[in-house]
Amino acid sequence: MSKYKIIMTGGGSAGHVTPNLALVPKLKELGYEIQYIGTENGIERKIIESENIKYHIISSGKLRRYFDIKNFSDPFKVLKGVFEAKKIIKREKPNIVFSKGGFVSVPVVIGARLNRIPVISHESDMTPGLANKLAAPFCNKVCVTFPETLKYIKDNKGVLTGTPIREELFKGSKIKGYEICKFKDTTKPVLMIIGGSLGSKVINKSVRDALSNLIKKYNIIHICGKGNLDESLQNVEGYVQFDYVKDELPHLMATADLFISRAGANVIFELLALKKPNLLVPLSAKASRGDQILNAKSFEKSGYSMVIEEESLNSEVITNKIDELFKEKQKYIKNMNSSSANNCVDKIISLIEKYKK
């Protein structure tokens, strides 16, 4: 029988889920039973259930900063989710709740507070997301990745921890990566494209438009997002595409020499930890609250990343930038090697241990 019980939450994108998984091995080692609360159709369900973690479903509406007709109905879904989460938490009696943000987390955090269960949350980006802003008053502590984020967290609740990184990412095998990709010319450097868990149409198009030039110099691993595979490119030598990867990811990342990526905090800190030179294409301000732009600028200023605005992206620019990145890769690796950032799993675990009921 487990000594303690923790309920985790977070969803909407993989970035609100995978940091939770980074904590799981250590929590199990300490004797915690782990359960998860998420939505029925969210990406979190697929990820969590594949880890054999007990999964509870609640209702939740999306939290938006812009006008949408659903803004009139979604608050009622959130309210329903609060009562559902409250009931689950009352029944399961966890010692603590850990939230990684995303719209599903708000009713869970409120449900925990209504049951007088302590809550630790984590904010990866430089400026807190709407869900974490709404949840913060109900949390005991809010872990943050960037020092600049602390000024947004009231009541002295902010704790600088960094972002948790899954241990398995450090155990990838380059040999297994090549076996998965079946590249014939192993002398070429490998370029890997990550457009986020949902994919990026603008990155996908720019890469595919530049493909005839890129594959002359690079083998290419393209994670393009669910529903974004291009069947016409399935047999192109030196180019392999996936809609989504899980167990293969550490091996693919070990194989890659260069990356093109969105600038979500989780993925950029993974690239930093693995010392992988990268070209970041943050989500535009029109399509987001601008958090990825701030993340990217911070990494560019530190010399960890090359950055290009989404609006400037095209096949010619992407080819030139990747060639430039490859020529200067040692400079970026040197800068990343001098970084003081490290895996923060132990820091977050110590807070969980301190505040558990």
UniProtKB/Swiss-Prot annotation:
It catalyses: di-trans,octa-cis-undecaprenyl diphospho-N-acetyl-alpha-D-muramoyl-L-alanyl-D-glutamyl-meso-2,6-diaminopimeloyl-D-alanyl-D-alanine + UDP-N-acetyl-alpha-D-glucosamine = di-trans,octa-cis-undecaprenyl diphospho-[N-acetyl-alpha-D-glucosaminyl-(1->4)]-N-acetyl-alpha-D-muramoyl-L-alanyl-D-glutamyl-meso-2,6-diaminopimeloyl-D-alanyl-D-alanine + UDP + H(+). UDP-N-acetyl-alpha-D-glucosamine binds at residues 13-15, 166, 197, 292. SUPFAM superfamilies: UDP-Glycosyltransferase/glycogen phosphorylase (SSF53756). It is found in: Cell membrane. GO terms for biological process: carbohydrate metabolic process; cell division; cell wall organization; lipid glycosylation; peptidoglycan biosynthetic process; regulation of cell shape. One of its GO terms (cellular component) is plasma membrane. InterPro entries: GlcNAc_MurG, Glyco_trans_28_C, GlycoTrans_28_N. Its EC number is 2.4.1.227. GO terms for molecular function: UDP-N-acetyl-D-glucosamine:N-acetylmuramoyl-L-alanyl-D-glutamyl-meso-2,6-diaminopimelyl-D-alanyl-D-alanine-diphosphoundecaprenol 4-beta-N-acetylglucosaminlytransferase activity; undecaprenyldiphospho-muramoylpentapeptide beta-N-acetylglucosaminyltransferase activity. It is a peripheral membrane protein. Belongs to the glycosyltransferase 28 family. MurG subfamily. NCBIfam families: murG (TIGR01133), PRK12446.1 (NF009102). HAMAP family: MurG. This is UDP-N-acetylglucosamine--N-acetylmuramyl-(pentapeptide) pyrophosphoryl-undecaprenol N-acetylglucosamine transferase.
